[in-house]
Amino acid sequence: MTDFLRARGLSCIRQDRVLFQALDLELSPGQLLQIQGKNGAGKSSLLRLLAGLSTPDDGEILFQGQPLAVQAEHYAASLCYIGHHSGIHEQLTAMENIAFWRAAYQLPYSDSMQLLGSLGLAGLEDVPCRMLSAGQQRRVSLARLWLTKAPLWILDEPFTALDQQAIQRLQQCFHQHLAAEGAIIVTTHQALSQDFPSLRTMELAYRW
Ligand SMILES: Nc1ncnc2c1ncn2[C@@H]1O[C@H](COP(=O)(O)OP(=O)(O)OP(=O)(O)O)[C@@H](O)[C@H]1O
């Protein structure tokens, strides 16, 4: 499928600073795009634009050939966005968070206990998330990736706080998603340790 996700002439201004301008971007099914850049370069701002959570100062973003604004509901159903923050309900347990996502995003049934076990959270399923470590909270947050059917994933620093084993597990999950014709945009400060044949990188320059 061509024209899966395309951005044309994007500009983003924050606090009178031009983070980027005239930025073009294209993503096809099966592709992984890694956005790189120094702290403050505008990576999260770009991801938020691409997720439809904020509006560019100039340019447009098309999903399957149509502007995001005319298909907000379809785009939301096609997207799994996980931001900088974990996005979990800290008062709820891991099991309750999964039940919440399943209801909110109308996800099909799957075995939550087994999923959490495979993410190294066995025995912690019923602990309120506020009592979990940073890496464990991140694992709960990323559990969404094993549940969602959305073809487009936009992930802001998903490896933060994860140990090596969890990083490898997450990259295996990327492979499966890409093999199933999914697409991923990710920001990371470190190089991906596994080989991704479809990987492209984009560097955002820090501008004063
Ligand atoms: N909503 C906002 N209002 C005002 N300024 C903002 C807003 N969002 C981001 N900024 C500013 O835009 C700049 C880029 O922020 P952004 O979070 O996109 O950078 P980043 O490349 O993701 O950085 P990091 O690697 O530190 O996560 C920063 O200087 C930040 O202060």
Predicted regions and their residues:
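Helix-to-loop junction immediately C-terminal to a conserved catalytic motif
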Residues: A51
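Conserved ABC ATPase signature
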Residues: F100, P128-G135
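Conserved ABC ATPase "signature" region
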Residues: Y109-E125
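Catalytic Walker B motif of ABC-type/P-loop ATPase nucleotide-binding domains
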Residues: W153-E157
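Conserved ABC transporter NBD signature motif
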Residues: T55-V70, H74-Y75
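Q-loop/switch helix immediately C-terminal to the Walker
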Residues: H85, E90-Q106
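Hydrophobic anchor residue at the start of the ABC signature
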Residues: L142, E181
